[in-house]
Each structure stands twice: as structure tokens, then as C-alpha cells.
């Protein structure tokens, strides 16, 4: 099904409950989006649905509304410990967002209860909440949900609770697989009844996703929703009201350009994407100092417990900056994001589309800007062809000033900042080496000296990619970096204590040093082969031991036959000597007399 047009909710071929229509009115959703008008009637008429739609097209309501309608039409009312709907999504931020939307609709249906099962919270608390309050609707991430199914020893029988399941939704299904949740999903699907309605929603279609469709859905209706007004021959994968730009700048000017842009748009809401967690930590801290009078938040995948609060705080802001990795790239709906800035291009082309989709959501206007090095210019043409995502050149950012000396001063004044910068540089280079578009993002063409200047490094780190090379264009600061102290007195005290201990022991710091090696596929294959060798040797040794045992048993049998008179001494000597001939050199079967 394609090219579904949008319209008012009353134009649907199925009737929605009055309370649902009232909530839609309160939320300001007067018109349906194409994906909603396509999916809701099919889902409500007991069809399995596999929907592909551009990011920001309103997929959440396309499954929340029919899920509620299906539960309302049940002949038997759900009991406290019966789960009627299960929604699985890849990230906790997206799960929180869906739970928030579901909560608004459940205000009109007090007979239903929901629970949010995500990482970053105490699983024991989740178990107790489920046991005492129950839940008719579960919104969860795969890891935590799988954990709950295994909590029978704690008195939670979730496997029995889901036997009443009517609706299963896999949201951002392509990313569920990308993030390695396939095994968890298969485990979860094993607990669920076959007689259910299943909806699978994604922004892209992959071969792995097709396998999941075949495994989890029964004769699904496939829906591909295209942006209104886009020709079938060139389906644009980003929202129609998104203005997509790129800007070219040298490595040492890149951060200066970003700071100037953020200063000029400080009254707007902006997302800034970096390629690694270490880059978020470093540049996020720098932006807090360099961009004044703006609320700046940082979020990345290694933050386990803080992420939920940071995400909620930023969503509530009218303006501000969220510095993040791709943990925020999919499905997250943050109100009124004006700009999505991609300081580092993502590791895959499809991620580029999803990052851009954090703005211009559900028909709103939005802008996206990617920062490219001169050597990366061909990426613009690649995106246009590969992802149907055309980019316009952005007029140069004005009032760019050199903030790198200030960044260096921050590193000189606090060892924490110095170490963050070094880690950020190393992680960036490693991420660049593993980029999916390696024909465009070539590590061998990277100007390491210019890059280090752009990171405001005091010296170059020791890493495999730089070994044996000289960089006359990079001038290290004339300072012993070991003398840079932590601003945090406790951390500095611990460092000094550690240094004193090392001196007392007089153990060379490099004694246990393991030489770093550059990442490569060939290296990984060699390592795997090495790991297999000891196992092969062990199997060989095991075979040899078994052979020795068989020979010993054979000798014992011959000796018994001799004692019982079944063979002569001559026969015995002959058979024993023939056995010795087959033994490896160095093995003596005599008694040693």
C-alpha cells in the first residue's frame, strides 16, 4: 500500500472511541498523517502490519490508538495480572516517550494500567511493581523485558501474564536488530501466544528485518508511506518540511564554526551529534564554557542512570543545546527542535537520515546541517543517490572567532579536561577508521596535525595510527603534561598517591604495557585463528591420551590370555612387539628391568 493521503480522524473507515478522539483534540492532532490513516484501520480489523515510513511521520499514534481500540473490544475484561498489549522499542528514551503518549490516552480509560520496563532503574523495583500493581500494557526495551521473563524465582510469572496478549508492537524494528537485540527478541517471542495482532514499524527495510517479519507476523499487510508530493521514482527519506544543509570547513576551523553557529542561534532548540561518547564528554564540557547563557545538556550511551533525567529535562526546555551520540538518533520526539547539527557524520548512511529526522517532525518545519571536511565533499552526492537525501550548501557562518586558545587554556588548567581531549581524539580516529563509507572517509587521507589542532590538543597521544610518523605542522605545547593537575582536589590527591606508590615500588610504568595495535579486519581474523589453535592442540592431546589408554587395555587383555593358557609365550611376545612398532618414538612399553 502506498501514497495514503491524510485527512480528519472522522474520515477513517473504522470508528474511534469518543475518549480517544477527545485526547487527540487536546493534543492538537486535528489531522491524521499518512502512516496513521494507513495503519489504524488495518490494525483494528485484525491484520498484521509491517509499516515503513519516514522518520517523524507520526508512527507512535499509528500503533497506540489501534492497540487501545483492540483492548476496548475484548469480550472478557483484562484482569490486573493480564497483559493485553506489549510495545518493544530499542532505547529507553523512546520507551519513555511512548509511555508518556500512552499515559495521556489512558486518562480516559482508568480500567487499563501500564508499566515502563527500561534499563537505568532497579529491576527488583520493577518486579515488585508488577507483582503488586500488575499491568495491562507493557512498554519496554528488550533487555529489561527478557530479564523480567526470567524472574520466576522472585515470584513474578510474566510468561503466564502474557498468555492473554492481543497486541504486539515492535517499534523502530530495524534498529532493534542493528543494536543486537535479535536473540532477546527471539526469546521474548517464544513466550508470546501465536494468536495475536502484530505491528512492525520502521524507517528502513533490511534483509534482517524481512526475516523478523516472516518469523513474527502472519500474512502481514505491507505499508510503505511516502511523503506527499514526492515522485515514486525518487522517494525522499527525510521529512518534506526539512531543510537539509551542509557546510565545508577545515579541521582546525570546525569547532570554531560550531561555536559561532550556536552563539547565533542560542534562543533556539538544537541537537548536536558527535561520533563517540568521548567526543560528547569533551566538546560538551567546552561548549558549557564557550556558549554563555544557554542551557547545555550532554547525553550518550555510556550514561546508565543519568540519561532518563537529562532527556526529560531537555524535552521540557523552550531553548537549549543537547550534545549527544546516536543514542538520540532514532524515533525520539523532542518538541520544537529547530536545528539538528551533525558535527561528525554518522558511521552509516541510514543513521544520517534518522539524525535529521529529530527535527521537522509530524509536518513541522525544521533544519539540519552537517559539517564536512574538504576531503569528504563527495558524501553530499552519495547521500543524494544512496539515501534520496539531497543537501543544499549552507551560506558561511558569520562572526567565526578562534576559541581554540581558550580550549587549550581549559586543558592546561584542569587535567580532567586534558585527558578528555586526548580520549576524544583517539576515539574519533578509531571511529573514522571503522566508517561504513570507507571510500569517502579514508583514514589514510586524514590530516592528523590539522585534526589535533582542531581538538586543541597540548600534545599528540600515543596511538597505533600515529606510530612512526612525524607531524611538523603540529606544534606541541612546551610543557610537561604530567605536571597538569586535576581541579578536583580529591582526584589530584589520588593521582599523587598513585605516583608516589609507583616511585616506591620502582616498577617501570611500561613493564606490563601491552602495545596498542591499529584496528583491522585482518588482525581480528588472525586473533580468532590463534584462539582456535590451543583448542585444536587440546583435541590432539586428548586423542593421543585415548590411544595410549586403548593400547594399555590391549596389553592387559593379552596378559590375561597368557595366564589362562589361551595363547603361548611366543604368541604373546609377537603381539606385544607388533604393538610397540605402532607407538611413537620415545614410548617404552617394557617394565624397565
Swiss-Prot record:
GO (cellular component) term, any one: nucleolus
Residue span of motif DEAD box: 171-174
Ranges where the Helicase ATP-binding domain occurs: 40-223
UniProt subcellular location: Nucleus, Nucleoplasm
Reaction catalysed by this enzyme: ATP + H2O = ADP + phosphate + H(+)
Gene Ontology molecular function terms on file: ATP binding; ATP hydrolysis activity; RNA binding; RNA helicase activity
Inactivation phenotype: Embryos have bent ceratohyal cartilage.
Keywords in alphabetical order: ATP-binding, Coiled coil, Developmental protein, Helicase, Hydrolase, Nucleotide-binding, Nucleus, Ribosome biogenesis, RNA-binding, rRNA processing, rRNA-binding
InterPro entries: DEAD/DEAH_box_helicase_dom, Helicase_ATP-bd, Helicase_C-like, P-loop_NTPase, RNA-helicase_DEAD-box_CS, RNA_helicase_DEAD_Q_motif, SPB4-like_CTE
Important for nuclear localization: annotated segments: 531-560
Annotated binding of ATP, by residue: 53-60
Residue ranges of domain Helicase C-terminal in the record: 241-405
UniProt region (Disordered), positions on chain: 524-545, 569-593
EC number: 3.6.4.13
Compositionally biased spans, kind Basic residues: 524-535
Motif Q motif location, chain numbering: 9-37
Main subcellular location of this protein, as a coarse class: nucleus
Domain of life, source organism: Eukaryota
Keyword Glycoprotein assigned: no
Residue ranges the record marks as coiled coil: 535-565
Family indicated by similarity: Belongs to the DEAD box helicase family. DDX55/SPB4 subfamily.
Function in brief: Probable ATP-binding RNA helicase. Plays an essential role in early embryonic development. Has ATPase activity and is involved in the maturation of precursor large subunit rRNAs.
Domain notes for this protein: The Q motif is unique to and characteristic of the DEAD box family of RNA helicases and controls ATP binding and hydrolysis.
Subunit structure as annotated in this protein's UniProt entry: Interacts with 28S rRNA. Interacts with double-stranded RNA substrates in vitro; the interaction stimulates ATPase activity.
Protein name, UniProt field: ATP-dependent RNA helicase DDX55
Gene: ddx55
Amino acid at each position: 500500500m502506498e501514497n495514503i493521503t491524510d485527512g480528519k480522524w472522522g474520515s477513517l473507515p473504522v470508528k474511534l472511541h469518543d475518549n480517544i478522539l477527545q485526547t487527540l483534540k487536546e493534543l492538537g492532532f486535528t489531522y491524521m498523517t499518512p502512516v496513521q490513516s494507513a495503519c489504524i484501520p488495518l490494525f483494528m480489523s485484525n491484520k498484521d502490519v509491517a509499516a515503513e515510513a519516514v522518520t517523524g511521520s507520526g508512527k507512535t499514534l499509528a500503533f497506540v490508538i489501534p492497540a487501545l481500540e483492540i483492548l476496548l473490544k475484548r469480550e472478557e475484561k483484562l484482569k490486573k495480572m493480564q497483559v493485553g498489549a506489549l510495545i518493544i522499542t530499542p532505547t529507553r528514551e523512546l520507551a519513555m516517550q511512548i509511555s508518556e503518549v500512552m499515559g495521556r490516552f489512558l486518562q480516559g480509560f482508568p480500567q487499563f494500567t501500564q508499566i515502563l520496563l527500561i534499563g537505568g532503574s532497579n529491576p527488583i523495583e520493577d518486579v515488585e511493581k508488577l507483582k503488586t500493581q500488575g499491568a495491562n500494557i507493557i512498554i519496554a526495551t528488550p533487555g529489561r523485558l527478557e530479564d523480567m521473563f526470567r524472574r520466576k524465582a522472585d515470584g513474578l510469572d510474566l510468561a503466564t501474564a502474557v498468555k492473554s496478549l492481543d497486541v504486539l508492537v515492535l517499534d523502530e524494528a530495524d534498529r532493534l536488530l542493528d543494536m543486537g537485540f535479535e536473540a532477546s527478541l527471539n526469546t521474548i517471542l517464544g513466550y508470546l501466544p501465536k494468536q495475536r495482532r502484530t505491528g512492525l514499524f520502521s524507517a528502513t527495510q533490511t534483509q534482517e528485518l524481512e526475516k523478523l517479519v516472516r518469523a513474527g507476523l502472519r500474512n502481514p499487510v505491507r505499508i510503505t508511506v511516502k511523503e506527499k508530493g514526492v515522485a515514486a521514482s525518487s522517494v525522499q527519506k527525510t521529512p518534506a518540511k526539512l531543510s537539509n544543509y551542509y557546510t565545508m570547513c577545515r579541521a582546525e576551523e570546525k569547532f570554531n564554526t560550531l561555536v559561532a553557529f550556536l552563539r547565533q542561534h542560542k534562543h533556539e532548540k538544537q541537537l548536536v551529534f558527535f561520533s563517540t561518547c568521548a567526543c560528547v564528554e569533551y566538546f560538551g564540557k567546552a561548549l558549557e564554557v564557550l556558549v554563555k547563557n544557554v542551557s547545555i545538556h550532554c547525553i550518550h550511551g555510556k550514561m546508565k542512570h543519568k540519561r532518563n533525567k537529562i532527556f526529560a529535562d531537555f524535552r521540557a526546555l523552550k531553548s537549549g543545546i543537547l550534545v549527544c551520540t546516536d543514542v538520540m538518533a532514532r524515533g525520539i520526539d523532542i518538541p520544537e527542535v529547530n536545528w539538528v547539527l551533525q558535527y561528525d557524520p554518522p558511521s552509516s548512511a541510514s543513521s544520517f537520515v534518522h539524525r535529521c529526522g529529530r527535527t521537522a517532525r509530524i509536518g513541522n518545519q525544521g533544519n539540519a546541517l552537517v559539517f564536512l571536511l574538504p576531503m569528504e565533499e563527495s558524501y553530499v552526492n552519495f547521500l543524494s543517490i544512496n539515501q534520496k537525501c539531497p543537501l543544499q550548501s549552507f551560506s558561511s557562518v558569520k562572526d567565526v572567532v578562534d576559541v581554540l586558545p581558550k580550549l587549550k587554556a581549559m586543558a592546561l588548567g584542569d587535567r580532567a579536561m586534558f585527558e578528555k581531549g586526548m580520549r576524544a581524539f583517539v576515539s574519533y580516529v578509531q571511529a573514522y577508521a571503522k566508517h561504513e563509507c570507507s571510500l569517502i572517509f579514508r583514514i589514510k587521507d586524514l590530516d592528523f596535525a590539522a585534526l589535533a589542532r582542531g581538538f586543541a590538543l597540548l600534545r599528540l597521544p600515543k596511538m597505533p595510527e600515529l606510530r612512526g610518523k612525524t607531524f611538523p605542522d603540529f606544534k606541541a605545547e612546551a610543557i610537561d603534561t604530567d605536571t597538569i593537575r586535576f581541579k578536583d582536589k580529591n582526584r589530584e590527591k589520588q593521582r599523587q598517591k598513585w605516583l608516589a606508590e609507583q616511585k616506591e615500588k620502582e616498577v617501570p610504568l611500561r613493564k606490563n604495557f601491552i602495545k596498542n595495535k591499529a584496528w583491522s579486519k585482518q588482525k581480528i581474523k588472525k586473533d580468532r585463528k590463534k584462539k582456535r589453535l590451543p583448542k585444536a592442540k587440546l583435541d590432539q592431546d586428548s586423542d593421543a591420551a585415548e590411544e595410549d589408554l586403548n593400547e594399555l587395555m590391549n596389553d592387559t587383555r593379552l596378559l590375561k590370555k597368557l595366564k589362562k593358557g589361551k595363547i603361548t609365550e611366543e604368541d604373546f611376545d609377537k603381539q606385544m612387539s607388533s604393538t610397540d612398532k605402532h607407538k611413537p618414538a620415545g614410548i617404552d612399553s617394557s617394565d624397565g628391568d
